[in-house]
Amino acid sequence: MEMLVVISLIGILAAIATPSLMDRIIRQQIEAALPLADIAKKPISDVWSKTKSMPPDNQSAGLPVPEKIVNNFISALTVKDGAIHLTFGNRANKQINGKVLTLRPAVVTDAPIVPVTWVCGNAIAPNPMTIMGENSTNIPDAYLPIACRGLTK
């Protein structure tokens, strides 16, 4: 009888721990993928500093086609109106495979000396910055790093 109780408890603990472990793995994959966006940040910032407009696509930013900018968890890095869209694929968990995380440039339009700041996912820009580009993030906030979540004031 005691053995059945122990086995039942182990089963319950395993059922509770498995989703938590999977969530942690997904968050780690997202965090591991984020540095790939650094490839595009400087070229986009350079275009802004020279033209006061954001590059409409990869080519205008001086980057290869989206499918050529990849890593273990990202299958494409797409620039659209200055925003960097990371499409998850390759070895990414099936929960985020095909999903997108967007990093958008934020600028102070009337103070061009202020450098571009990057806003991750559903986060909001600091005042008085203006976010450029559209947010295509479709990954649930629970999986995103805290800095990428849509926190309210």
Where are these regions (language model features)?
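Periplasmic/extracellular, small/polar-rich flexible segments of pilin-like filament-forming proteins
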Residues: 49-153
